[in-house]
A protein has these predicted regions:
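N-terminal transmembrane-helix/juxtamembrane module of multi-pass inner/ER membrane proteins
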Residues: 17-26
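Short glycine/serine- and small hydrophobic-enriched flexible loop segments
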Residues: 242-253, 287, 291
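Short glycine/threonine-rich catalytic loop with a Thr-x-Gly-x-Asp
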Residues: 226-245
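Intrinsically disordered, low-complexity serine/threonine-rich segments
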Residues: 179, 183-184, 350-356
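Glycine-rich phosphate/dinucleotide-binding loop and adjoining beta-alpha-beta core of small-molecule
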Residues: 25-160, 166-169, 184, 195, ...
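Conserved phosphate/ATP/ADP-binding segment of small-molecule kinases
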Residues: 102-221, 227-231, 248-282
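N-terminal glycine-rich anion-binding loops that anchor highly charged ligand groups
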Residues: 2-18
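Charged C-terminal helix
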Residues: 259-354, 360-436
Length: 436
């Protein structure tokens, strides 16, 4: 947001060392009282003259309620000044994905109570299902979920992200037709249907579906499809919501007719879905997203290899210091070959293979020998199990290290690609969805 000209007052809801996608992190969650206290400090210094607010991940219900109170207070202040369009709340209802919650269960009803105060919400497909209580399985159920959100909560603007439907299009083109009658499948041109005309390669796609309601709370829906990049990234949701805030404001201010003075920046009912500021903003946001993600993915393999080499060297140094391998014939009972390779096979000392015998004519020596053999076998079995456990643990740690290296390599390369944020080339256009 700062790179696009916004003065930002960041109020953290968590203090984590890194993105939770790393599967390990340190830090603390900010309490509701701390959030309230920080905002009180801003007000005391007259630093609460905000035009917009973006709220994202809030881990607990009390903290979420505190964030909601801040937003409601800012909206009430704008209303009291007689300038309802002077404050705009973008709410990303972060609750879960792919059918699973990653917040506490009591967070869901709090979001259901807050979305009615938001101007724009950015749920993913799973979160839209939670809020609308409509299972999204195809385009008709998706448009029904949008209608419910408009009608039940009076949410002015909605963008549903990461939409993937069974009947969705698998071919993406920047020249797709502008109308989608209840389905995301593109209509083929006569040339495409003609004899001998080659078809474009079929590519897995994702979509975002957006809508701005009319004065009667009816949807004006559109869809933007784009090719999915088969790669894991850290921070895409945060990037999308931040860009939507900036580009929505930009699109509204570029619209004539005093839209900036209207509550929730709602366009006239006569404005077509494809001409909505929301649609224009989403096109530009996805252009930036696709460029940055593509450039991040291009260098990811090399970054993983460099990180792996660095970690391997560090592990070798630590092992050399711990085991005393350098200049020693063996370490911790493991044989070291001429090439420096540590042989992890169990080594038995000569004393362990010595059998006791007697010459007094009885069988005590044989019995002692049998017991010794049993002890040797037990010791060998114990060491074998220890070695197997050590190897399994090493495999687990190796997979963990690889995930951490991939996660680091998957961090979005934002600073290196500022031009993609500021001046993206819009390639994927919105298409109208006819809602029944």
């Amino acid at each position: 947001m700062q790179s696009l000209g916004c003065d930002v007052a960041a109020l953290n809801t968590v203090q984590f060392s890194n993105h939770t996608g790393y599967r390990q992190f340190t830090g603390t969650r900010v309490s509701a009282s701390e959030i309230t206290d920080l905002y009180r400090g801003l007000k005391q210094s007259y630093l609460d003259d905000f035009d917009m607010m973006l709220s994202g991940y809030v881990p607990g219900a009390p903290a979420l309620e505190a964030v909601g109170e801040i937003a409601k207070e800012l909206k009430e202040k704008a209303q009291a000044r007689g300038k309802p369009g002077s404050f705009f709340w973008v709410l990303d209802p972060v609750m879960g994905d792919n059918g699973s919650l990653y917040v506490a269960q009591d967070v869901v009803p709090v979001y259901k109570g807050l979305v009615q105060y938001a101007d724009l919400i950015l749920p993913n497909q799973f979160e839209a299902e939670l809020l609308s209580e409509v299972k999204i399985v195809d385009m008709p159920s998706l448009t029904r979920a949008i209608s419910v959100l408009h009608e039940r909560y009076a949410i002015p603007h909605i963008i549903i992200t990461s939409v993937s439907l069974p009947d969705a299009a698998t071919t993406v083109s920047s020249t797709m037709p502008n109308s989608v009658p209840g389905s995301s499948a593109p209509t083929p041109t006569p040339q495409e249907e003609g004899q001998g005309q080659s078809q474009p390669p079929r590519t897995k796609t994702l979509s975002v579906v957006g809508s701005t309601m009319t004065s009667a709370r009816q949807p004006r829906a559109f869809q933007i499809s784009f090719p999915a990049i088969d790669c894991y990234f850290s921070g895409t949701g945060d990037m999308f919501s931040a860009l939507m805030l900036v580009r929505m404001r930009e699109a509204v201010y570029n619209t004539e007719g005093g839209l900036t003075e209207r509550e929730s920046w709602l366009s006239d009912d006569s404005v077509d879905a494809l001409d909505l500021p929301l649609a224009k903003a989403a096109e530009k946001v996805l252009a930036s997203m696709h460029e940055v993600l593509t450039k991040t993915a291009e260098g990811m393999k090399g970054r993983v290899q460099r990180a792996k080499g660095f970690v391997d060297e560090q592990l070798q140094r630590e092992k050399a210091m711990t085991d005393g391998v350098n200049g020693c014939g063996h370490a911790n009972g493991h044989e070291t070959g001429q090439d420096g390779h540590v042989d992890k096979k169990p080594r038995l000392d000569s004393t362990q293979t010595t059998m006791t015998t007697t010459t007094n004519g009885n069988s005590d020596g044989d019995e002692d020998g049998e017991k010794t053999e049993e002890r040797i076998k037990e010791e060998e079995e114990r060491r074998r199990k220890q070695m197997e456990e050590a190897e399994k643990e090493e495999e687990v740690q190796a997979r963990k290290r690889l995930h951490l290296m991939k996660s680091k390599a998957a961090e979005l390369r934002l600073v290196r690609h500022l031009d993609s944020l500021r001046h993206p080339k819009v390639e994927f256009r919105a298409r109208r969805i006819e809602c029944s």
